[in-house]
Design a protein with these regions (language model features):
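Active-site/binding-pocket entry motifs
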Residues: 14, 154, 167-168
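Conserved small/polar residues in nucleotide/adenosyl-binding loops
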Residues: 173-178
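Active-site-proximal cap/lid insertion segments
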Residues: 1-103, 116-123
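Polar, surface-exposed loop/tail segments
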Residues: 54-56, 94-161
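Residue-level detector of short, conserved catalytic/binding motifs and their immediate flanks
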Residues: 86, 159, 166
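Low-complexity, glycine/alanine/valine/leucine- and proline-rich hydrophobic stretches
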Residues: 164-172
Length: 178
């Protein structure tokens, strides 16, 4: 998906950043990742010490990825894979550990937590519960085989559909999007 017109998803001018500044930005990004990893470790350690780890559902996710010079961008606001493919971790102590690589939507987090906690879900709730996936009873593709991302720009709207293998992205100009 290295299509030149997709660069216009960014409102930030496409200016060449000097190599030294680029290294500094990448270093800062990795420092942030290391810092948050340490903070998560502190939370898990506190849950363990308090005896709550085995009855606590842990959910970690990032709201977007980040461009570190790929596609000539140094930001987060695009429909490129680097911005929409984000970390998502859900640990339910009563469920088997597993790794799922099929994309899911953030809309599914709330209904999943409602089901895991035994709470009644509100009517007309967006998103599909992934509780059957978390419990190891179903594959994500049996619930929803794709994830959708949408990103508006001035005068444009970008859409992406992603499954486990393919991604389709389109850019519609405002007059086309109506």
């Amino acid at each position: 998906t290295d299509i030149p017109s997709l660069i216009s998803f960014s409102d930030i001018e496409n200016v060449k950043i000097p190599d030294e500044k680029a290294r500094e930005l990448v270093h800062g990004y990795y420092a942030c990742i290391s810092y948050i990893d340490a903070q998560i470790g502190k939370i898990v350690e506190a849950l363990e010490k308090s005896g709550c780890l085995n009855n606590t559902i842990i959910v970690l996710w990032g709201d977007h990825g980040w461009h570190l010079g790929d596609h000539g961008l140094w930001n987060k606001h695009t429909n490129f894979e680097q911005a929409t493919h984000v970390p998502f971790l859900l640990i339910d102590p009563s469920s088997p550990a597993q790794k799922v690589t099929t994309p899911v939507e953030f809309l599914s987090i709330y209904p999943t937590l409602c089901d895991l906690a035994g709470l009644k879900k509100p009517l007309n709730l967006d998103g599909e519960s992934l509780v059957e996936v978390v419990k190891g009873k179903k594959d994500v593709v049996n619930i929803k085989p794709y994830a959708v991302s949408q990103y508006p720009r001035v005068g444009k709207m970008g859409y992406s559909l992603r499954d486990g293998r393919y991604r389709y992205t389109c850019l519609l100009y405002t007059s086309d999007a109506a």
